Swiss-Prot record:
Catalytic function, reaction form: L-aspartate + NH4(+) + ATP = L-asparagine + AMP + diphosphate + H(+)
GO BP, one annotated term: L-asparagine biosynthetic process
Enzyme class: ligase
Gene Ontology terms for molecular function: aspartate-ammonia ligase activity; ATP binding; catalytic activity, acting on a protein; transferase activity
Species, as recorded: Streptococcus pyogenes serotype M1
NCBIfam families: asnA
UniProt name for this protein: Aspartate--ammonia ligase
PANTHER family attached to this UniProt entry: ASPARTATE--AMMONIA LIGASE
Any one cellular-component term (Gene Ontology): cytosol
Keywords, sorted A to Z: Amino-acid biosynthesis, Asparagine biosynthesis, ATP-binding, Cytoplasm, Ligase, Nucleotide-binding
PROSITE patterns reported in the protein's UniProt record: AA_TRNA_LIGASE_II (PS50862)
Pathway entry: Amino-acid biosynthesis; L-asparagine biosynthesis; L-asparagine from L-aspartate (ammonia route): step 1/1
Signal peptide: none
InterPro entries xrefs: aa-tRNA-synth_II, aa-tRNA-synth_II/BPL/LPL, AsnA
Length: 330
């Protein structure tokens, strides 16, 4: 039992360390330290889809402020790039840990505990466009494939990912599968191609509904790109044979500029956010144009080691029935 546990931990560490090294080298980012707490009222907290309640924390020696455990570091990263004067093409990555207690379900792929490679880069002049988004996606996908090949060489786990990732807009997907739900569409397209980047998540589609929810103040999901499609963000999805479904590894995108921010908060009715310090700084031109995202660490490990449950690669909290159903939950 001890031997199996140690081997399990070594595998997890190998995947994380290998991916980190490739990501830093290929994406050309520097690893930095990030926060676990965000001060309430400064607008730095990531509101995700806008419905999640963060964990509130009171600090004894700072009685005049309330803090929250971060959901992600989307806004903090952009603030940090500005604060320390990162130049065009430069960026950072954080080994981020967060709590999301309002997850809809605790299942094979969802946990209260979230760990990500949370990265952000300053966009080079003239590249705030779909082509640069795709170029960055291809770089990250290359890192995923290189890590998968390293796992294959070390642990004899067969590599399954295609050489290229397929790009498709959410508008194309709803037209292709009009009678399917968003999740069913993801399953259909990802099973066909093996690896997909789904572009444009957050805006309302021709069927009157968004593909999925996104907060209005980090990713740009409204800018028109090509053929009348909208959005400069998306998800990296791969086909997971263990689960028999599409599997999200990363959510990422080009971040809002001043116009996209104002447009999106009006669409979602969140104009009050424009009064936060972070949002004022963006509107006043104090932040660089950036691209960024989060890559799930436990999800990456789970996929590359062909595990059935995310609890096999991270230590979290689970209902007893989950622990009873899976022998290798940590």
């Amino acid at each position: 039992m001890k031997k199996s546990f140690i081997h399990q931990q070594e595998e997890i560490s190998f995947v994380k360390n290998t991916f980190t090294q490739y990501l830093i080298a290929k994406l050309d980012v520097v690893e930095v330290q990030g926060p676990i707490l965000s001060r309430v009222g400064d607008g730095m907290q990531d509101n995700l889809s806008g419905t999640e309640n963060p964990v509130s924390v009171n600090v004894l020696k700072i009685p005049n402020a309330t803090f929250e455990v971060v959901h992600s570091l989307a806004k903090w990263k952009r603030h940090t790039l500005a604060r320390f004067g990162f130049n065009e093409g430069e960026g950072l990555v954080v080994n981020m840990k967060a709590l999301r207690p309002d997850e809809d379900s605790l299942d094979q792929t969802h946990s209260v505990y979230v760990d990500q490679w949370d990265w952000e880069k300053v966009i080079p002049d003239g590249k705030r466009n779909l082509a640069y988004l795709k170029e960055t996606v291809e770089t990250i996908y290359k890192v995923i494939r290189l890590t998968e090949l390293a796992v294959e060489a070390r642990y004899d786990i067969e590599a399954v990912l295609p050489k290229k990732i397929t790009f498709i807009h959410t508008e194309e997907l709803v037209a292709k599968y009009p009678d399917l739900t968003p999740k069913e569409r993801e399953n259909a397209i990802t099973k066909e191609f093996g690896a997909v980047f789904l572009i444009g998540i957050g805006g309302v589609l021709p069927d009157g509904k968004p593909h999925d929810g996104r907060a209005p103040d980090y990713d740009d999901w409204t800018t028109e790109t090509e053929n009348g499609y909208h959005g400069l963000n998306g998800d990296i999805l791969v086909w997971n044979d263990q689960l028999g479904s599409a599997f999200e590894l990363s959510s990422m995108g080009i971040r809002v500029d001043e116009e996209a921010l104002k447009r999106q908060v009006e669409m979602t009715g969140d104009q009050d956010r424009l009064g936060f310090d972070w949002h004022k700084s963006l509107l006043n031109g104090l932040f660089p144009l950036t691209i960024g995202g989060g890559i799930g660490q436990s999800r990456m490990v789970m996929f590359l080691l062909r595990k059935q449950h995310i609890g096999e690669v991270q230590t979290s909290v689970w209902p007893q029935e989950v622990r009873d159903s899976y022998d290798n939950i940590l």
